[in-house]
Amino acid sequence: MFSLISAGVAPGVALLSYFYLKDEYEAEPLSFVLRMFLFGVLLVFPIMFIQYVLAAEGIVASPAAEAFLSAALLEEFVKWFVVYFFVYDHDEFDEPYDGIVYSASVSLGFATLENILYLLANGVETAIARALLPVSSHALFSVIMGFYFGKAKFAVKKRRYYLWASFLLPFFLHGVYDWLLLAKERWGYYMGLFMLALWWAALRKVKQAKGYARPQAVPPVKSQA
C-alpha cells in the first residue's frame, strides 16, 4: 500500500517542485503553495460526483461530450475558479511567474489524488503511464492557465482577454487530450504528437513568464518647489 501511494504521489510532487524551483525572483510561501495543492485535492470528490451524475443521466453520451463537457469544461473551470478567487488578488501574487506556480499547485493537487485513486483501482503497474499522461497533462494545462493569469494580473491592456485565455486555452487542450484517449483509433500516435507539442508550448510559456520584468512600484515625483 505504501509503495502504491508513493507511486501515486511522486509525479505530482516532482512536477510541482520543478515549477516551484523555477521561480528565480522570490520563492512563494511554501505554506500558501501547499494550501492551494490541498485545495486541488479537495476538488476531486465533488468533480467525480458531478461526472457520475452527468454519465448516469446520459448527458455525456458521446466521446466528444465526455471529453469536452464532463472532463475538460468541469475540471478546468473549477481549477480556474479556485485560482481566480483565492490567488489572483492575493498579495503573494506579485510577479507574472507566480500564476504558473499557483495554477500548478491546484492542478497537481487534483491530479495527485486522482492518480492515487486510479492506482488503487488498477494496480501500480499503470503508474508510469499515469505519470507520463494524466498527471503531466494536468501540469501542462496549468502552465498555460497560469501564464495567462500572470499576463492578466500585470498587463496594462487586454486584461479581460488574458483572463478568458487563462480558462479557454486549458479547456480546449484538455478536451482534445481526452478526446484522443476516447477515440482509440491510433490514439497512441496522435497522443504522442500532442504531448510533445504540449510540453514544448508549456516550457516556452515557463521561459517567457520568467523573462518578464518583475513589476516595480513607480517612485513618487519629488517637488521642485
UniProtKB/Swiss-Prot annotation:
Compartments reported by the entry: Cell membrane
Known EC number(s)? Answer: 3.4.-.-
Keyword Membrane applies:
yes
Q: Does the keyword Chaperone apply?
A: no
Q: How does it sit in the membrane?
A: Multi-pass membrane protein
Instruction: State the NCBIfam families in the record.
Output: intramemb_PrsW
Q: Which family does it belong to?
A: Belongs to the protease PrsW family.
Q: What does this protein do?
A: Involved in the degradation of specific anti-sigma factors. Responsible for Site-1 cleavage of the RsiW anti-sigma factor. This results, after two other proteolytic steps catalyzed by the RasP and ClpXP proteases, in the release of SigW and the transcription activation of the genes under the control of the sigma-W factor.
Please report the name of this protein according to its UniProt entry: Protease PrsW
Q: Which gene encodes it?
A: prsW
